[in-house]
Amino acid sequence: MAMKVTGGFILDENGEQVAKDVYIKDGKIVEHVADGDIRQQFDATGLLISPGFVDVHVHLREPGGEKKETIETGTKAAARGGFTTVAAMPNTRPVPDNAEQLDLLQARISETAVVRVLPYASITTRQLGQELTDFKALKEAGAFAFTDDGVGIQEAGMMLSAMKEAAALNMAVVAHCEDNSLINGGAVHEGHYAKAHGLNGIPSVCEAVHIARDVLLAEAAGAHYHVCHVSTKESVRTIRDAKKAGIRVTAEVTPHHLLLCEDDIIGKDPNFKMNPPLRAKEDRDALVAGLLDGTIDFIATDHAPHTAEEKSASLERAPFGIVGLETAFPLLYTHFVKPGTFTLKQLIDWLTVKPAQTFNLPYGTLQVGAAADLTLIDLKANETIDPSMFLSKGKNTPFAGWDCAGIPQATMVAGKTVYKKERITNE
């Protein structure tokens, strides 16, 4: 079946807006389709036609956490936010730490996901940090990469072994960097906010010391080491130095760490509680600078839904994490592109081709022959963030009430429309 997306514009290699019709056949982008062969047509007049967004850090919670989110609700949220490919973190119950569990997870993905879902496998059995999983069997079963995200690998020897195993299979080790001996039972960053509210704080070095250790281990193992949700200036410096030394390290940053710091926390609202925590303003500034200079490779949401009951607890007792799939692009476009800090092309690249290239994925592009994963965006449309409108089960966001521009209007995965607003017609 052939389709034509007409009237929109794309960004060329220089970031210039160019009017472009996009032709789709059999789920792939093609150069042209004869008018007589077109069976569906979308009116994208005035819309940016972007490659579908790629998010390599999403918590879908299923199996075991279906009260927070399911594969179905999480991928519907992804589609609404313009994401066509997401990678699902393994901190579920049970953990996908063997081929059988990974097979069951992939069957569930096939049944209920509305966007493409790539499953992570865990580095260690049950994510306990004590025994390596069977990397070879998990790769053969379809693992995207290996991570124990949610907890850090505490033993250097265990991490080195994991990196050697992954390197032999040309797979990435993806790390949540946190030294348990330095957490201090903290709920927020160890800074002036913690002091003012009498709270235990998590120091910056809790994250940075693991990165400093791991880049040396990655060098020794010859592994691709990817750092999740970088949050501190020390981490940025360490990654920058490692890249200069030729170590194969990549890194991501979340929208919330780019947008917020501890100064922005309102009262003791648990919707401002995430891990890693919101750091100092100089850390936030270092993250923006690191993204701009290439130290940080791309943006990932760390979408982490929780129930309203869980997030209604005190700041000290509520779980870490916020949702992000449905707010990422509008927030970043409004607060970084419109003021001129980022170009539109930079933002699109950090959400598409950059994560795809980092993990050797054939997505995030509008090239002929690529999967027809498209996100159609009205850059002039405005909305106020309203959690009651989220398709995610999780409503836990610190951005409620924020006004944003740049609203996704439709999302297509392999040529199939998985999300749309009213203006997309003639399906």
Curated annotation (Swiss-Prot):
GO molecular function: allantoinase activity; dihydroorotase activity; zinc ion binding
EC number: 3.5.2.3
Reaction catalysis annotation: (S)-dihydroorotate + H2O = N-carbamoyl-L-aspartate + H(+)
Residues reported to bind Zn(2+) 1: H57, H59, D149, D302
Stretches that traverse the bilayer: none
Pfam families on file: Amidohydro_1
Binding site for Zn(2+) 2: D149, H176, H229
GO biological process, one term: purine nucleobase catabolic process
InterPro entries the record matches: Amidohydro-rel, DHOase, DHOase/Allantoinase_Hydrolase, Dihydroorotase_CS, Metal-dep_hydrolase_composite, Metal_Hydrolase
Claim: Hydrolase is one of the keywords in the record: yes
Functional summary from the UniProt entry: Catalyzes the reversible cyclization of carbamoyl aspartate to dihydroorotate.
Protein name (record): Dihydroorotase
Lineage summary: Bacteria, Bacillati, Bacillota, Bacilli, Bacillales
